[in-house]
Structures are given as C-alpha cells and as structure tokens.
C-alpha cells in the first residue's frame, strides 16, 4: 500500500499538523529537525535515518506518519518492556496498536491474528521483536500482509543494535536486512539516539537502505544537562555524597511531602542496587532497587511507584529506562563506570527531557574501571573463540577507553561527548565541572596520582620488551632481565607456550575450586526452639552440634516406645507418657557430652523399653532415672576438678606480705607444736584404732546418723549439724565418691583425725562454756549454712592454750580434708570459681606440711607472739578461725584478682562507660591491686569486686580520667 495518500504538499502538511493536535495533543513540533523528519517520512519516497538524543521526539517521527497511513506499520524494537511502554502510551491516545510477542495469551493472540486477516485491519502499528520477525510462526502473517499490499512502513527502533561497532550489538538485528529486502516497496525508517559515523554506515549497509537516504541527525549537545565526575577514592563518605547530590537535584519538596522530580541511579550489579537503595533510604532518601533478580510483579510495582513519584529515586541496572517516557527526571547518577561512551550518553540522556536543568554524575574509581575492563576483555575472548577475530572487536575497547579518557582528563565533558560522536565542539557555557572549575579538577587528578589506592598499574600496554626496571630482574622470569640470556631463544613461540601454560593453569585452578566448593564447612547455626517445644532446657547448647530438631526426634522415639510398653503391659491408669518421655530425654541429655553418646543413650533406653514390652512388663521409670542421674554425676566433671588456665598461676609459690607464712593458713600458733607432739605420742594407739575403724573419721553423706564424727570431732552441741554447709544430695554423692579415696591415701591424716577424737582433745569442752558470751552479729552465719569451722572458734573465748590448740587442729585438717570440712564451694566460692586449696590438692605439688621440721617450727614461731592478742580479741579470733575455710585470704594472687576484675568490668567497657581502652586497663589494674592487698571479712573476691565497681559507677556516667578513681578506697579489713 502506498505511504503517500496526499495529492499536494499543502494538503500533506495540513493533515500532519491536524493529527499532531488532535491525536497527540501538541500545538507544534519540538524542533524544526523533528518536523522535517516527519514530513520526509510522510512523503514516503526515501528511506529515512533519524538520530536524535533521548527525549528529542524520535518516536513521533514514525508514530504520526503511521496514524496517517492507510496500512499497517511494522515496528521492530529490541525489548518487550520497551514495546509495552510504547503500546500503553499509544493506547492512552486511542491509537489502534498491538504487539505480537511470546507473552500474549492464546485468546489475545487469536484476536490479533484474526484482525490482521481482515480486509481492512483496525491495527495501525504492529510492534514485534527481531526474534519474532525471523521466527517461522510469523512468516504466514507477514506473507498475508505483503500479498494484500497492507504494509505502509518498516520501522527499526534502536537501530544502533544492528552495528557491531555499536555499544549494544544484537545479532538478531542482522536478520532485518533480509526482511527489508522483502518489503522493497515500503519505506524503511531507522531511528537511534546514539550513532557514531561508523555505526551510521553499518546501519545503512545492514538494513539495505536505499540511497540516497534522508538523514536527520541532531547534535548530541544538550545545554540543560550538567555533567560532572566524582572520584570515589577522594570522598570520605561516598554514600553521603550521593545523598547530598540527590537531595540537591530533587530540590524542595512539595506541601504533600513529594519531590518536584525524580532520579535514576545506575549500578553494575544487582547486589550493588540492593545495597545502595538501603544506604540511601537509611540516609533520608526514599529509594528502591530495580533489577532482573526481582519478580516481574515486583519490578512493575517499583517502576509504577517511581513513575507516580511515590518513590523519588530508583536504583537500577542498565535494563531500566529504555522507552520510559518521563520528562521530569532531574538527575541520573552512575555508581559505576559504564561499558562505553555511547551507553553512558544514552543512559545519562534520560535526564531533563522537559528541557529544565538536570544533573548527570559519574562516580569513578580505578577499581570499577579495572573490573569493567576485565569483563569486556573476557566477553571478547569468548566471542573470538567462537567466530575468530574481527575488526569490530576493537570498537568495544575503544568505546570504553573513550569513557575512561572522559573521566581522567581535564577538559570539557560536553566536548568529549561531541568528539566521540563526530560533532563539532559545543558552547558549553559552564555546563560541566571542568568548565566551571578547571583548577579544582586538576587538583583532584593530582591527588589521585599521588594516592596509594591509585597505584602504579595501568590498562595500557607494557613496554615492548616487557622489562620493568622497577621490578626484580625486570619482572617475570624468562621475559626480561639477565635470566633471558640463560634460556633458549625467545619470540612468538615462547609467548604461545606461556599463553597455553596460563590457560592450562586456569583450567586446573577452576577444577580445584569447584571440587572444594562442596567441602567448605558451613558455619554452625543454632535454631532456637519454638514456643510449643516440649523439651526441658531446649535452648541449652550443652552438647555441641546437637540441634533442637534432633532432640525432638529422640523425644518422639522415647514417647512411642513408652506408649507401646504401656499397651503391651496392659497398664490402665492414665499416666502422662509425654512427661515421662521428657524426663527420660532430659536425663540422657544431662549425662551425655557428645552427640553420638547422646543418640546412643537414647537408643539404648528405647531398646530397654522394647525389651520390657516384649516381656510384658511395665518399664520402671524411677530406677532408670536414678541410674541415669548417677551416671550423669559420675561422668560430669566437677567445675573445680579441672581449673581454667588462669588459675594455674595459683599453684606457683606466691609472694605474700611481711609477717605471713607460706602455708595455706597464714596464722600459726605455738600450741600447734604441742598438738604435733601429742599426736606423735598417740601414733601407735591411733594406728590401732584406724585399723579397727578405718572410715570412722570420714563423713558419710549417705548415713542417716548425723551424730557420727566428722573431721575428727567426736561430739557436737545439740541441734548443730555435723556436715558443714549441708551440700545437696548430688554434691554429697559426688563428694563422697571422690573424697574418700583421697582421704584414705594419707596415713598422716588418719593419725591426726584419730588423735582429735581423744578425750584430752575433745572439742565439747570448748562448746559447753560459750553460751555465756554471744558471738558478734557479723560472724553469725545462717542456719542453713552453719559450719563448725565458722561457729565454734568464733564464739569460744576460753584460755589461750585451748584456743590455740583449736586453731592448730583447724590449720592441720581444714586445708587437707576438702570433703569433710566447710563446704567451700557452697559458702565462699560462686559456681565456676575453683578453690585454691583444692587446686593445691589436685596437682601433686610439694605441700607446706611436708617441709622440714626446722622450717615449720621457724614459721610457726613468728606469729606466736600475737597469741595473747588473738585470745583477747573476739573479732580477731573469729577471723583466724574462719579464714582457712574461705577464699577471702590475703594471699590471693594479683593474677586471680585481675581475672575477676576484668570479667566484671568488661560489660561496662562495652557500654561505653570508659572513654578509652587505656583508661579501662588503668582502672582494672588499680582495682586488681586493691583487691590483692586486702579484703573485707566474710566477703569473696567476686563480691568485693562487684561492690567496688558498683560504688565507682554509682554517681558517675563515664570514666573520663585517672583522677576519677583516686578517691576509690579498697576494702577495709
């Protein structure tokens, strides 16, 4: 069908202007060049090539003539999304337009094809992709239209895709030349926004455009766009810089809170889009990500919100923007360098289509540049392996190098773009950063050259011989330097071998990495239990690598086994089987230390239950629970048996203050020597009694008779408790099993205990007379934690000899008999703090009692002069008697005190209560020395440390200088 339905030029111009007003709603054309191009297409006697910047009105150059023509115009466009935008726009103008693509439903496709089969189709424009144009399914429709002479125009949008010299080459566009040859009688219109002279020649040749071609090309210069380049290496906060740029470009917000425009930020990767959208949103700029990784519905929603300006900034990959008709885009920012100058110009040109001032910024960094360069070369290498080398391969590198030059050289940005596209240098009039402040740009580039991140490496080729004088022996072995003379002749053969070796190594490396990918250990992630989890201590991570899911599975096994057992035994009472299963599982969990042992224990219990079911017996839960608990206690090591590394320092001989002995008890009396001599006299008799009653001096926690002697004391005041501290049954069981063997191992301890049971040394004579003098309130312990070691000596104020003898007995026996003496673990030490006395026993170190008689006598005679003072001062007596059974001994090491201080002080440091780490260390050092020097009576090191820290921060928000703790006094004794 003829595309020239008008008889005269005047009639043609009148119809064009009338359609422009009635259909498209414009009173006049945007530019004279646009009007000339439309008139040439409407005339229809030549093929037309149109090159106009984005937003200059290219689409109208073929849409208006298509509406005036009587036939159908086929429009080839590269993207379905771009096609859909054009179709929606024309449908809003009530233009009959359709798209034939793979996303149509069966019904829509059927309706479209039936319309095209009519004698006079209603469709004026038919949009297709180049793939559809070459497909076999489209050929019958095309042949039908050709045979009926219903084709008015063939329009190729984004015609630069046909050129291998272009920035967006698509091989399917090359097939359009054959389609153009079949439509020889219909004019062809090729349109693009970017075309270098080389690309323009390729378009003419590939599309078989008839000469002479009516060419309409607008200069690429756009005066309303301001171009600038920012260097990431010189910006302390790049996200903040981008935020400021966005807010400045968007301008003041309207009364309803919306911005007067919108903006686009382009990123190279999907991950960068997501990250940048989050960073901008957190800094007060509402932004959303748009990329191919999102679902189609999500992408549509984000695009619609941006079009409606609900979201002012969209962070997208380069797939966004083609065909998006939005005039008030106030800025376009590139977070990474683009792949070509043409691509950058096309993407940045989406700003300011309304002619108002807009901004285009490129964030440039050498790292981004190297990454993009690597990807370009990698893509070229793949293509060359398939099809060989082509001259057009250089075009891709040249296009990228042009953009690198655009960023790294001082010069007008608009002039650099115009030079690339073959246009004359425009009158910039301070339309870019270089023309506005060239000195500042030079200063930035100089700073980049001297920055460490800029480095020495470059993209350009190396020297011809490959010898670098700054590298050792000129660089790579065999390629330069003196080593070159030691090997055979070089040349192209050596280079070929090097390349082959490099490829072989790369393949080997990739294979090895692929093998290791599946073997990488994944970090353990503990899944917390749900709200309805029936397990006890479900959130406990006592057993490593044991998940809650595995424990629940084991619980189900136990519950099912118990259920079958009840059915097999014919039990009728409604016992809660789940509760029993939970108890069994928890006991197994407590007794096991490893996942395999836990699972084995569960399976063993299941087997026992099944065995009971097979015998027709009801499974005995109580005996199983007791045995499991006993096993748990036997297998579970005490917190005090294996001291942490920091407490091993306590095993070393410690330096103590003047006047203190080196033994476990600092106070020794002269009466201890008397006690020793009496013990030696009674040794034969004690040995005989020890044979008859070998365990009478050991407290038996299982024995119900509480009047049995403990620690060698034969009697006790009525109502008093024999076992010190009254530990729990579990601890008593554990203590008796561990302590009896240790106690029997020492014959000397048996002798001393037997001697203590003699009437001449009975403690009852001291206890009978102390009711006359009540003890001080501070020294009275609670009824539950009553201890002979803490009560008896503190209340007795008899003669000096008796008191001294009592102290001697305690000094001899308390440090040695851990299980039978005061419960240090329960009274003085919090859980997890090992006893220094027990540490001395655990390690086979020389004991003070094993020293020579002369040294022991000398040490005991030193404090003996103060025995009268001890007898006359009740508080002193109380302290002397209690201190061997508590941690708060003046001989605590500085290392132990420092460990405790750091442990309790660290949370305050993490909360920012110290302005510096040095100040934190200084205060910890000061506090450790205070604790090591003296302690309050009856308080442990941990209690004293907590008290001092609480006192220090009571009226102080932060510790700001060393002067803050100068007034902090240590504990007073």
Swiss-Prot record:
CDD domains: DEXHc_RecQ5, SF2_C_RecQ. The lineage of its organism: Eukaryota, Metazoa, Chordata, Craniata, Vertebrata. Belongs to the helicase family. RecQ subfamily. This is ATP-dependent DNA helicase Q5. The modification Phosphoserine is found at residues 489, 492, 728. Zn(2+) binds at residues 412, 428, 432, 435. Residues 840-856 have a biased composition (Basic and acidic residues). Residues 863-878 have a biased composition (Polar residues). Disulfide bonds: none annotated. GO terms for biological process: cell division; cellular response to camptothecin; cellular response to xenobiotic stimulus; chromosome separation; DNA repair; DNA replication; double-strand break repair via homologous recombination; mitotic cell cycle. Keywords: ATP-binding, Cell cycle, Cell division, DNA damage, DNA repair, DNA replication, DNA-binding, Helicase, Hydrolase, Isomerase, Metal-binding, Mitosis, Nucleotide-binding, Nucleus, Phosphoprotein, Zinc. Its main location: nucleus. It holds the Pfam family DEAD. It is found in: Nucleus, Nucleoplasm. Monomer. Interacts with TOP2A, TOP3A and TOP3B. Interacts with RNA polymerase II subunit POLR2A. Identified in a complex with the RNA polymerase II core bound to DNA. Interacts with RAD51. Interacts with WRN; this interaction stimulates WRN helicase activity on DNA fork duplexes. Interacts with MUS1; this interaction promotes MUS81-dependent mitotic DNA synthesis. Phosphorylated by CDK1 at Ser-728; this phosphorylation is required for RECQL5-mediated disruption of RAD51 filaments on stalled replication forks. ATP binds at residues 52-59. One of its GO terms (cellular component) is chromosome. DNA helicase that plays an important role in DNA replication, transcription and repair. Binds to the RNA polymerase II subunit POLR2A during transcription elongation and suppresses transcription-associated genomic instability. Also associates with POLR1A and enforces the stability of ribosomal DNA arrays. Plays an important role in mitotic chromosome separation after cross-over events and cell cycle progress. Mechanistically, removes RAD51 filaments protecting stalled replication forks at common fragile sites and stimulates MUS81-EME1 endonuclease leading to mitotic DNA synthesis. Its cofactor is Zn(2+). Residues 241-398 form the Helicase C-terminal domain. The modification Phosphothreonine is found at residue 527. Residues 653-726 are annotated as: Interaction with RAD51. It catalyses: Couples ATP hydrolysis with the unwinding of duplex DNA by translocating in the 3'-5' direction; ATP + H2O = ADP + phosphate + H(+).
